[in-house]
Amino acid sequence: MKKNITNKILMVRPALFAFNEETAVNNYYQKRDNKTVEEIQNSALIEFDKMVEKLKNIGIDVKVIQDTKEPHTPDSIFPNNWFSTHYSNTVVLYPMFAENRRLERTDRIYDFFDNVDDLNVVDYSSLEKENIFLEGTGALVLDRKNKKAYCSLSQRADEKLLDIFCEDAGYKKIAFHSYQTINDERKAIYHTNVMMAMGENYAILCADSIDNLEERAAVINELEKDKKEIVYISEQQVESFLGNTIELVNNEGVNICVMSATAYSALTDEQKNIIEKYDVILPVDVHTIEKYGGGSARCMIAELFI
């Protein structure tokens, strides 16, 4: 049976990271201030390089693509949204909500695949023209071992394409709706991977964000069926990106839970103890990237299974 986790990942080193106006319309985690683009980029670059160094030092095989200034892709640091890889020597390309994020696609990812001779490319990106979006492992939290796709439906996660993905990949669909409170209003959470994360033996879940109690129970039931120990997190902890973690395995077979320093500081002792039963926690400081990009450690990592 295939594992849910990998040792090999791809990350994109930013050339001009910045607050993205096009994504801010439904990513309420993005914040802005009067810092210059240069200041933001310089801080993000330091955080990125330190994160790569920490990952390598703990035994993760990190492949890095250096982004270019042209075309300007302010969110290129989050490559997991536009492609995913799978054990069947398959790469899936996804349709993106923001027009400037569509420019992130690059054939340079193929340089890091072990076997490109019989690569199966599943390309859904043309569905952008029909305003149908499914933003990779931002929209999809995949349990690769049990072949389940958890998806919080939103402007960036279309159920029609979710159905197609699940049929093509042989996954069971677990679709639901999750929300956050913005100015006393319940607004859709833009990506599933900010409120949920999948490990081999545990799952992190903000159940409180799933307002529909039937949907909430269905998600919990699927996780319990697969004997996942659930780490329940609050909506406030989602704001600290505790849902945006990723489990990797190092070169010695030790499971590593990568999360931001912001997320780590939000952990309760009980939550920390559950995760540390199975994983070594690796906190990384990406506060600039979180603030202006509205994404955290998990968003920065594209897993390579081929």
Regions found by a protein language model. Give the residues of each.
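The feature marks the mature, well-folded catalytic cores of soluble enzymes
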Residues: M1-I306
